[in-house]
UniProtKB/Swiss-Prot annotation:
Domain of life the protein comes from: Bacteria
InterPro entries: CitG (IPR002736), TriPribosyl-deP-CoA_syn_CitG (IPR017551)
UniProt similarity note: Belongs to the CitG/MdcB family.
EC number: 2.4.2.52
GO MF term set: ATP binding; triphosphoribosyl-dephospho-CoA synthase activity
Membrane spanning stretches: none
Catalysed reaction, written as an equation: 3'-dephospho-CoA + ATP = 2'-(5''-triphospho-alpha-D-ribosyl)-3'-dephospho-CoA + adenine
Alphabetical keyword list: ATP-binding, Nucleotide-binding, Transferase
Originating organism: Streptococcus equi subsp. equi (strain 4047)
Gene name of this polypeptide: citG
Protein name per the record: Probable 2-(5''-triphosphoribosyl)-3'-dephosphocoenzyme-A synthase
Swiss-Prot/TrEMBL GO biological process terms: prosthetic group biosynthetic process
Amino acid sequence: MTKKVFDDISRLALKALLYEVSLSPKPGLVDQLDNGAHDDMSFLTFVDSALALAPFFKIYLDIGFYHAKEDPGLIFERLRASGIEAEQAMFSATKGVNTHKGVNFSLALLLGATGMYLADQPQLLDHVTAFTEEDSLAICQLVKPLTAHLLETDFGSLDLKKELTYGEKLFLDYGIKGPRGEASEGYPTIAHKALPFLRKSLRSTDQETAQLQLLVYLMSIVEDGNLIHRGGIKAWRQVKQDMLLLHNSSLSTADLKAALSAYNDKLIQKNLSPGGTADLLVLSLYFAFLENQL
């Protein structure tokens, strides 16, 4: 039974990756309509990447489940080692293009945490779609001890480093913690914002529209390192402001798609891509599938 459930959950993670890239239109991002602000990747590049990562999803679950009683730091190291192997498989499939490096990091953590949670909640092994809102929140919380050391390890002695990564510069200059911060805090954007928003939207509209609305909402709130890297703080804040206006409008699905398509043209012209938002959309969809919301 455990193997079947883990196979099913692994497929949900793959499904989340495929749903994200398929959702269209997504401003600045690769989708079924165009390549967004990317000239080195396409829809099929993302499909190849997702399929290359898929075999590792069950490995992440196994690590969390079978090592649940170990020190969280050791579990993290196991997940990181397998995550690096997955990353290498991704780069091999995409011929060196970084499609899913960031979200692979997060999926390793959240699938590992899902395995840990199942070790403590064996009744869930009988029904893969029986997860509740409380289960999702608990899984996010389990990431905290896994990543408690990350910020201190990665950002603790930046004043002593001669060369800084872009993420390190963002932290020093603006206090933006990026994916490390989101993980170390138990994915609050997903648990307390994205998932409640998506659940509510799905009660009043169809699945595609709800996902597009979630995309807009996330773009209006996320500290998107990809946007900042490409356009700077000012450009990121402008995108957030524009998306907040769109979020607060009451557009039909057709008008929403038209607005997103027009904004896609704008972001392409400025070479801006909200990749951080895309990653959080994937993770939100993963939990929505676990809860059988989608």
